[in-house]
């Protein structure tokens, strides 16, 4: 039994070692099979693509390095010429990009012109009615009065005011180049419209008035209708009394219209007084300025053309006695000389 067991043990030891090798081998084989099972055919394709991509990146890197070496050698060979060439290409690229951006901005601006269309989409009969209403003060101030949110009528009135100012400059004899006359008239008209509208809107914001900037531009623009009427008449008919009458009636009506609208949209006595008083003072004083800015020159031209206020008869009457006495003295002297010659 012992011999048989010994033989069995001697036989078992090499087989045990062989079994260990088999187990180790099978262990490694199992691990490899699991990895092979986990990786599908697409994984092998991805690995191939990865190797291809790495190869392409290496080629691109090699080409870039070669290009840099060539550029370095070319730049060293050309010196300042190569540097100037590179700067020229960079400047040309920047100019091209800047022009491209400007062209795209111009195209976008032209495409966005339709944004302003609602502010100028108005019928002529509506403009006529609003011009008439600008001289009729509203009576109901308990609720906010409606203000048209359009800019066609106000802008046309500003251009009309510019034309009237040019007419006044020409009749007053202002000797300035035409471009300066036009620029002064446009600056005066649009400066008052935009500047006073912004200032009154700022005061309205401080006084908590319910009015927008667009409504303020429309309200003040239509308020210039009275100014246009008064200036057109008084620039052609030079009478102080007529101007003051039109200033009080027409200018006052247009101012009262705007004041009534602002009162209906403002709460509180003090805010109403500040807001409406500022607007009324600026609007009425602006009309006085536009009239008297060239009034002195007009009077000087009229005095030059018509002469001084002294009647010509009085001037002749003062000169007549002097002339008569001189003639009489000359006649007496001539007669005395003739008499003396006859006596001799």
Swiss-Prot record:
<feature type="transmembrane region" description="Helical">
    <location>
        <begin position="213"/>
        <end position="233"/>
    </location>
</feature>
<feature type="compositionally biased region" description="Polar residues">
    <location>
        <begin position="1"/>
        <end position="12"/>
    </location>
</feature>
<keyword id="KW-1003">Cell membrane</keyword>
<protein>
    <recommendedName>
        <fullName>Protein YIPF3</fullName>
    </recommendedName>
</protein>
<feature type="topological domain" description="Cytoplasmic">
    <location>
        <begin position="1"/>
        <end position="146"/>
    </location>
</feature>
<dbReference type="InterPro" id="IPR051521">
    <property type="entry name" value="tRNA_Mod/Golgi_Maint"/>
</dbReference>
<feature type="topological domain" description="Cytoplasmic">
    <location>
        <begin position="264"/>
        <end position="272"/>
    </location>
</feature>
<feature type="glycosylation site" description="N-linked (GlcNAc...) asparagine">
    <location>
        <position position="329"/>
    </location>
</feature>
<feature type="transmembrane region" description="Helical">
    <location>
        <begin position="186"/>
        <end position="206"/>
    </location>
</feature>
<feature type="topological domain" description="Lumenal">
    <location>
        <begin position="294"/>
        <end position="344"/>
    </location>
</feature>
<keyword id="KW-0333">Golgi apparatus</keyword>
<keyword id="KW-0472">Membrane</keyword>
<keyword id="KW-0963">Cytoplasm</keyword>
<keyword id="KW-0812">Transmembrane</keyword>
<keyword id="KW-0221">Differentiation</keyword>
<feature type="topological domain" description="Cytoplasmic">
    <location>
        <begin position="207"/>
        <end position="212"/>
    </location>
</feature>
<feature type="region of interest" description="Disordered">
    <location>
        <begin position="1"/>
        <end position="24"/>
    </location>
</feature>
<keyword id="KW-1133">Transmembrane helix</keyword>
<comment type="function">
    <text>Involved in the maintenance of the Golgi structure. May play a role in hematopoiesis.</text>
</comment>
<dbReference type="GO" id="GO:0005886">
    <property type="term" value="C:plasma membrane"/>
</dbReference>
<dbReference type="GO" id="GO:0030154">
    <property type="term" value="P:cell differentiation"/>
</dbReference>
<feature type="transmembrane region" description="Helical">
    <location>
        <begin position="243"/>
        <end position="263"/>
    </location>
</feature>
<keyword id="KW-0325">Glycoprotein</keyword>
<feature type="transmembrane region" description="Helical">
    <location>
        <begin position="273"/>
        <end position="293"/>
    </location>
</feature>
<feature type="transmembrane region" description="Helical">
    <location>
        <begin position="147"/>
        <end position="167"/>
    </location>
</feature>
<feature type="topological domain" description="Lumenal">
    <location>
        <begin position="168"/>
        <end position="185"/>
    </location>
</feature>
<dbReference type="GO" id="GO:0005794">
    <property type="term" value="C:Golgi apparatus"/>
</dbReference>
<feature type="topological domain" description="Lumenal">
    <location>
        <begin position="234"/>
        <end position="242"/>
    </location>
</feature>
<comment type="similarity">
    <text>Belongs to the YIP1 family.</text>
</comment>
